[in-house]
Amino acid sequence: MNTLGRFLRLTTFGESHGDVIGGVLDGMPSGIKIDYALLENEMKRRQGGRNVFITPRKEDDKVEITSGVFEGFSTGTPIGFLIHNQRARSKDYDNIKNLFRPSHADFTYFHKYGIRDFRGGGRSSARESAIRVAAGAFAKMLLREIGIVCESGIIEIGGIKAKNYDFNHALKSEIFALDEEQEEVQKTAIQNAIKNHDSIGGVALIRARSAKTNQKLPIGLGQGLYAKLDAKIAEAMIGLNGVKAVEIGKGVESSLLKGSEYNDLMDQKGFLSNRSGGVLGGMSNGEEIIIRAHFKPTPSIFQPQQTIDINNQECECLLKGRHDPCIAIRGSVVCESLLSLVLADMVLLNLTSKIEYLKTIYNEN
């Protein structure tokens, strides 16, 4: 379907080369000050055309808020917003309108719906992720009210791994690299892929932490069975174009360890390690929430590739257009937005966990 979330619900619409894309964010509490500078900055972080390491397609990505905001504050009603597509070049896709691009959604969309929007992939395009970033900015405004911060960066490009994590450096980096020392090597790997008309995969690190030093995240976000925090995070991120795996905490490495090596021991001050990635039993345990999202190489490459057309005839696919050589770079920003949306949803869900919370609200009235 086209909706993410339960209490804070984002519904998106629009296609890559349509007039507009947009969303409706329902469930946002009233009285939250709308930070227009934050919204603009989040959109710029995802925006293309900023350097040679991302797509040359540079949309303005101005968010037009159509409802749910009055005199600078959320009203509690659905926040509707539009983002205009102004830099689409549909002619770049004329030569492939009847064939399936390898490892794209063309094949499955055509067989499911029987109708295919070949212009930039239509609804399956990562262009839709701009909506998630806009909605994530609103979620960040909510989380800021209770001292929760989400941030992200790149920890791996083409197998070249970061050795240090510096989220402040990532904000300044052209590729959002977390490790300044490894950044140039990672950039070279991307440039080599571009020279070879190829693409390259990568891994993003996303985390949530308390806005205040020496303070913890809220304990108990999420529910133990059918609204597990880690499950909702994984669902949101694996639903993003190009993400093939999501790890929480130690993730895959956990399967290689013994219990004595993995367990997070405790003392009176709290946990002595964070191999669980901030989630136990489907709920936040107060520690930083740590996620890794693994992105496949961009399937849009400029090498001749064998494929078939809509009549099942073999043919050659030679792409044109403007594409990211490494989707992990801009994808890291989208994952950060998705984590913000999931956490905001879980914050609202948590209001139902204790009768004391409801009494506090209604006894004040």
Swiss-Prot record:
Homotetramer. NCBIfam families: aroC, PRK05382.1. GO terms for biological process: amino acid biosynthetic process; aromatic amino acid family biosynthetic process; chorismate biosynthetic process. Belongs to the chorismate synthase family. This reaction introduces a second double bond into the aromatic ring system. It catalyses: 5-O-(1-carboxyvinyl)-3-phosphoshikimate = chorismate + phosphate. FMN binds at R123, S124, S125, N241, G242, G281, K296, P297, T298, P299, S300, R322. Pathway: Metabolic intermediate biosynthesis; chorismate biosynthesis; chorismate from D-erythrose 4-phosphate and phosphoenolpyruvate: step 7/7. Pfam families: Chorismate_synt. GO terms for molecular function: chorismate synthase activity; FMN binding. This is Chorismate synthase. Reduced FMN (FMNH(2)). The lineage of its organism: Bacteria, Pseudomonadati, Campylobacterota, Epsilonproteobacteria, Campylobacterales. Its EC number is 4.2.3.5. Gene3D superfamilies: Chorismate synthase AroC. HAMAP family: Chorismate_synth (MF_00300). Keywords: Amino-acid biosynthesis, Aromatic amino acid biosynthesis, FAD, Flavoprotein, FMN, Lyase, NADP. It comes from the Bacteria. GO terms for cellular component: cytosol. It is an enzyme of class 4 (lyase). NADP(+) binds at R46. Its cofactor is FMNH2.
